[in-house]
């Protein structure tokens, strides 16, 4: 085990402070509508230009190991806030820095760090309760567009596209962000359930121009087994042929004699049919097939349930208004499953999402939920250069997370005003005469910083702006985009409650932990081995100028 370097007491905390200040300052320059960009060098390709706090934080690594520990802890604040709320990373970083700086002064003056931590925790509880009381639900498309615009650094196009996407696919719908081929940022919406499996044979195509099979008012046969023998299918095919309706077969595989017979019947016009491979793999495939069966009102044909293909009747098949199949995707629109069954299935999936510990599983469950509930929207981000594309795509993703947070917990006035309005509640908080009251004062000072920093980044005097906001009431605050004092809610300067809450909770949690730190342990830097004896002594002087 390598030797360790250990720092104690005040020197340890001061090293943490230097790391916290370095990272926080790099991130804080991006705060607000007039925040500046940060250019980040990449080991290959063009540098990244960003105004996203968490992107800046993730790139920072300091040379001093003790200072780096402080920076990494604040980086954790930004990452956690981004993961939980999708935005507010810069605010969280500014709050964490202020709480730690103010707390450190008090610890140096001899106050008890544990009592300070308790005071900070009590104050945060009061502020969170105030934010919830201040919160109002989003009222339709305009509120969502405003939240998206602010999170996308004032880009109204992004805000409007996200609002439109949410309106079309609903709160539970999946909205994905992809890179467009052109310069325009556009929205594509897929109605109904779509899965990434196309037709088993191009002979099933009904529209040669678009190379897709369109089935109007079809029956849907769902099975998790492989179909190779035609004999299994004959009874159900005869019933479907008599009904005159098209048929979509979703199976693990349709091959051999069965596929050949289906193709021949399709070409002769005897049967309007299309076969596709079942989506997913393993257990996920079984669940997706159950989703399709529930949506269309059919039954999954599974040997373990004692259901066989040859025993199927029309009542066991699903129905849909329209199904389109191309070489890559199948889309089922208006499945005719019972509403109660679909809602029960949705409830089961929601329960699984809450219990899931895996990010990947949760994402897949969320996709399944969206497909059952009503659709998928794709925002195609367009830009002139790759650098601009990356920056714009990151802003769209941030804005998307922020709008979801707004829909979930509502909105509060932006610009740091919601925090300032909670100061009155903190002044009434009684924690006795001990050091806890100083912990409350730490939070009081920290809550002024988001509004102060937004004003400073816009070229105003921060403390003067904060005092003027405190003289007002309700949503009255400083709109840095227009350099005016006004009702921020009416001006569309709003923040998701979840973002404001999460930023404060994460900042206070990490900063108060750092305050109670008394020792730091890090690996000692290894001494670089001295250059070899005289190995290069006889070489020509020109070697000295070479780069290694």
Curated annotation (Swiss-Prot):
It catalyses: ATP + H2O + a folded polypeptide = ADP + phosphate + an unfolded polypeptide. The keyword ATP-binding applies. It is an enzyme of class 5 (isomerase). GO terms for molecular function: ATP binding; ATP-dependent protein folding chaperone; isomerase activity; unfolded protein binding. Pfam families: Cpn60_TCP1. It comes from the Bacteria. InterPro entries: Chaperonin_Cpn60_CS (IPR018370), Cpn60/GroEL (IPR001844), Cpn60/GroEL/TCP-1 (IPR002423), GroEL-like_apical_dom_sf (IPR027409), GROEL-like_equatorial_sf (IPR027413), TCP-1-like_intermed_sf (IPR027410). GO terms for biological process: protein refolding. Its EC number is 5.6.1.7. One of its GO terms (cellular component) is cytoplasm. ATP binds at residues 30-33, 51, 87-91, 415, 479-481, 495. Keywords: ATP-binding, Chaperone, Cytoplasm, Isomerase, Nucleotide-binding. Signal peptide: none annotated. It is found in: Cytoplasm. The keyword Iron does not apply. Forms a cylinder of 14 subunits composed of two heptameric rings stacked back-to-back. Interacts with the co-chaperonin GroES. Together with its co-chaperonin GroES, plays an essential role in assisting protein folding. The GroEL-GroES system forms a nano-cage that allows encapsulation of the non-native substrate proteins and provides a physical environment optimized to promote and accelerate protein folding. NCBIfam families: GroEL (TIGR02348), PRK00013.1 (NF000592), PRK12849.1 (NF009487), PRK12850.1 (NF009488), PRK12851.1 (NF009489). Belongs to the chaperonin (HSP60) family. This is Chaperonin GroEL 1. It comes from Anaeromyxobacter dehalogenans (strain 2CP-C). The lineage of its organism: Bacteria, Pseudomonadati, Myxococcota, Myxococcia, Myxococcales. The gene is groEL1.
């Amino acid at each position: 085990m390598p030797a360790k370097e250990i720092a104690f007491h005040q020197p340890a905390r001061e090293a943490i402070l230097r790391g916290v200040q370095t990272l926080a300052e790099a991130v804080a320059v991006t705060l607000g509508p007039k925040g500046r960009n940060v250019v980040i060098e990449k080991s290959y390709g063009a540098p990244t230009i960003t105004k996203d706090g968490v992107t800046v934080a993730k790139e920072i690594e300091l040379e001093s190991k003790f200072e780096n520990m402080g920076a990494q802890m604040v980086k954790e604040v930004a990452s956690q806030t981004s993961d939980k709320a999708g935005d507010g990373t810069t605010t969280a970083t500014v709050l964490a820095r202020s709480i730690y700086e103010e707390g450190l002064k008090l610890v140096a003056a001899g106050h008890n760090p544990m009592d300070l931590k308790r005071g900070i925790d009590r104050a945060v509880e009061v502020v969170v309760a105030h934010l919830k009381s201040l919160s109002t639900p989003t009222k339709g498309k305009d509120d969502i567009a405003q939240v998206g615009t602010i999170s996308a650094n004032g880009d109204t196009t992004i805000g409007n596209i996200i609002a439109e996407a949410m309106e079309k696919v609903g709160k539970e719908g999946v909205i994905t962000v992809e890179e467009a081929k052109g310069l325009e940022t556009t929205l594509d919406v897929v109605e109904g359930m779509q899965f990434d499996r196309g037709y088993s044979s191009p002979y099933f195509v009904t529209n040669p121009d678009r190379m897709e099979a369109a089935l109007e008012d079809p029956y849907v046969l769902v099975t998790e087994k492989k179909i190779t023998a035609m004999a299994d299918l004959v009874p159900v095919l005869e019933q479907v042929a008599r009904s005159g309706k098209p048929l979509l077969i979703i199976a693990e595989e349709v091959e051999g004699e069965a596929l050949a017979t289906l193709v021949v019947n399709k070409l002769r016009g005897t049967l309007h049919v299309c076969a596709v491979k079942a989506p997913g793999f393993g257990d996920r495939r079984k669940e997706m097939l159950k989703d399709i069966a529930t949506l269309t009102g059919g039954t999954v044909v599974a040997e373990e349930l004692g259901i066989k293909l040859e025993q199927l009747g029309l009542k066991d098949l699903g129905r849909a208004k329209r199904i389109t199949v191309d070489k890559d995707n199948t889309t089922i629109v208006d499945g005719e499953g019972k509403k109660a069954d679909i809602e029960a299935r949705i409830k089961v999936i929601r329960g699984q999402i809450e219990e899931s510990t895996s990010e990947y599983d949760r994402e897949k469950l969320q996709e399944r939920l969206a497909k059952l509930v009503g659709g998928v929207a794709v925002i195609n981000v367009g830009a002139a250069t790759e650098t601009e594309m990356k920056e714009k795509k990151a802003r769209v993703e941030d804005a998307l997370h922020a709008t979801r947070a707004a829909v979930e917990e509502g909105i509060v006035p932006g610009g740091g005003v919601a925090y300032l309005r909670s100061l009155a509640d903190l002044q009434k908080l009684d924690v006795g005469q001990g050091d806890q009251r100083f912990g409350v004062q730490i939070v009081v000072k920290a809550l002024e910083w988001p509004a102060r920093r937004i004003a400073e980044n816009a070229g105003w005097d921060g403390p003067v702006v904060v005092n003027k906001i405190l003289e007002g009431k309700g949503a009255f605050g400083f709109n840095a985009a227009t350099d005016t004092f006004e009702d921020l809610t009416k001006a569309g300067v709003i923040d998701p409650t979840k973002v404001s809450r999460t930023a404060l909770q994460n900042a206070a949690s990490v900063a108060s932990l750092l305050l109670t730190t008394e020792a730091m342990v890090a690996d000692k830097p290894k001494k670089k081995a001295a250059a070899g004896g005289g190995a290069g002594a006889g070489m020509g002087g020109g070697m000295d100028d070479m780069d290694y």
